[in-house]
Amino acid sequence: MTDIRKMKGKERLVKEYDQLTNDPDINNCFGIDYWDPDADNPDITHWQITLIPPVGTDYEGGFYKIEAKFLEDYPISAPQMKFVTRIYHCNIAENTGHICLNSIKDDWKPSLIMEDVLNHIMILLYKQNPSSPLNDNAAELYRKENKTEFLAKVKEYSKKYANINDYENLKKQDIHLLANCKCIWCQIIFRYKGSF
């Protein structure tokens, strides 16, 4: 890969990061930051994404961390993404956090941007696909007509692994903003929730 192509990929990442972090319609349900293992050397190719699903969803009350890594040939190759926070979901591997999502696998196109990917992840939280599971146990419970047992497991994981009160660095006003998000994504999903 040429240095020019690598530079273009990083320029695009910076542009996407700036757009995502400055757009109030997005920034209310996702907090996005560079991964910063070394405070002196932040890395634009490694993002930490915070997701707080809106009130009224199965994952309400959870505080989820997602990791995104971008290879040198991004956007030719898809971002490598996984949930860092354990989550009980048909399409998310319980122990590794890997996500079964076509838009970051077989259907990836360089024309997709991170806003699209985050939108797809948000929709995946509302509309699971038990016919393509990474968590067979979750898929089995999800397929049952009465989802009480599945929802109890979701809440158990949310309380145990995604408890918002465990994150001291999150300000109370941020919690209120995120948990009551009125962004276009959340509004679209609420409007069409019954038709998914």
Predicted regions and their residues:
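UBC/E2-like fold recognition across ubiquitin and ubiquitin-like conjugation systems
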Residues: M1-F63, E67-F196
